[in-house]
């Protein structure tokens, strides 16, 4: 969806997708249709000059915390989860490059044959040159989620907004997919998210956003054009900020 002459409110953003967001209708792994739709939305933002960083989870392929609960060493499981995020990042890179979008995958762990090492200054330079940057392998450390990685990378690159893509159109008082009485919440403070234990992002990620005054927008990734509306400054989904 084009901006139709409207001026974008944000010039540099960090977008967070869960690995599960890529499953689509296939039940497991990566649905090419979902990846293509995400790539098309990002292509439009890239075309109008928005600098985009992207963090994707790996839960569609592997979830280390789940196997740790049944006996696997947690550090080993988390390392396997990091590799799953690299696989998702490469799939998104491929889809974007087929649309003509210059894209770089930067990994927090060294896999030089398939992607670049993450270096903050190099990542910012890629963004300034109009390249979309996908940050893979989380923070590179076990016990930290990709939500925390998204907050960290957003702060490091100086993003004006952190955007989290979900299956519902924002934050609710309870899971709307299982509770029909769940109420939509359009605005929250960081402290309200923490105090009410709302499932927005993990607590570490929210605290980082709060401490660095990084606004967070939660929206429904399945709504075509929603990202463009957010970039224009429209009130889409739920805004988490100091106010």
Curated annotation (Swiss-Prot):
Subcellular location: Cytoplasm
Protein's GO biological process: 'de novo' CTP biosynthetic process; UDP biosynthetic process
E.C. number(s) listed in UniProt: 2.7.4.22
Keyword Cytoplasm included in the entry's annotation: yes
Keywords: Allosteric enzyme, ATP-binding, Cytoplasm, Kinase, Nucleotide-binding, Pyrimidine biosynthesis, Transferase
GO cellular component terms, A-Z: cytosol
Primary role: Catalyzes the reversible phosphorylation of UMP to UDP.
Protein's recorded name: Uridylate kinase
């Amino acid at each position: 969806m084009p901006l139709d002459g409207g001026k974008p409110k944000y010039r540099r953003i960090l977008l967070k997708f869960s690995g599960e967001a890529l499953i689509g209708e296939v039940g497991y792994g990566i649905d090419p249709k979902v990846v293509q739709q995400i790539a098309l939305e990002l292509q439009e933002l890239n075309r109008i000059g928005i600098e985009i960083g992207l963090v994707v989870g790996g839960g569609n392929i592997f979830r280390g915390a789940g196997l740790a609960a049944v006996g696997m060493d947690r550090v080993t499981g988390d390392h396997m989860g990091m590799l799953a995020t690299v696989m998702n990042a490469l799939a998104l890179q491929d889809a974007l490059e087929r649309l003509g979008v210059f894209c770089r995958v930067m990994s927090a762990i060294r896999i030089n044959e398939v992607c670049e090492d993450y270096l903050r200054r190099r990542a910012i330079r890629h963004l300034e040159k109009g390249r979309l940057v996908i940050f893979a392998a989380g923070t590179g450390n076990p016990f930290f989620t990709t939500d925390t990685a998204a907050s960290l990378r957003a702060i490091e690159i100086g993003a004006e907004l952190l955007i989290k893509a979900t299956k519902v159109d924002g934050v609710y008082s309870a899971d709307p997919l299982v509770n029909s009485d769940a109420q939509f919440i359009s605005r929250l403070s960081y402290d309200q998210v923490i105090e009410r234990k709302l499932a927005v992002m993990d607590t570490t990620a929210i605290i980082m956003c709060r401490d660095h005054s990084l606004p967070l927008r939660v929206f429904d990734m399945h709504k075509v054009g929603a990202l463009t509306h957010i970039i224009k400054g429209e009130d889409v989904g739920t805004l988490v900020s100091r106010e």
